[in-house]
């Protein structure tokens, strides 16, 4: 699977979470309600990078990507 195909699969998962039959919690979220989560994940990623802990950094950067992509999709839905 190419990187583009993998990202599309990831994005399709986000769309499914926000769909009418998706996750109730995800459907209730707004960019503003997710703002603090994005900030927290970014700081956690920075801490992991500062600690020079690649595995932890990858995990936290994944969380940043998830939050940023979710928020971007929310704006796309408007």
How would you name each of these model-derived features?
Residues 58-78:
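Hydrophobic/aromatic-rich structural module bridging two neighboring secondary-structure elements via a short loop
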Residues 1-57:
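Extended low-complexity intrinsically disordered regions
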